[in-house]
Amino acid sequence: MTVEVHLVTPEREVWTGDVQMVVAHGTDGMVGILGEHAPLLVQLAIAPLRMQLEDGTWLVAVVDGGFLHVSSDDGVTRADVLAASAELADQIDVAAARARLEEAQARSTADDELAAAEVAKAEARIVVAG
């Protein structure tokens, strides 16, 4: 059984396709989605989203929070990933991501949630891009 994935942001559809498995980081921990999964709604963390394609290779994206909604209808399992922003690994400029990380770290303080989120996103982008 496969999972039909739709990775979207408010601006665009980032990726759509069938996968064997989805691995996502929720705010309460990791979740794995296979075919015939029970309905589920998960709040996503700023983190990598991993999708195992039908040929066994992995497609990785970074998502900036959002939600993962899993539904099953007539034997079709669908995973809708609704993120504030998302990028596939091959779309990330590693040098630019490192520069953004350094900028965010320089602005970050213990009390600044926005800067902490920027640091988390920059770190996730670097991890995803390799």
Identify the residue ranges that each predicted region occupies.
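Acidic/glycine-rich phosphate/pyrophosphate-binding loops and surrounding catalytic core
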Residues: 80, 86-130
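N-terminal export/targeting signal detector
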Residues: 1-4
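Compact, glycine-rich, soluble single-domain proteins
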Residues: 6-98
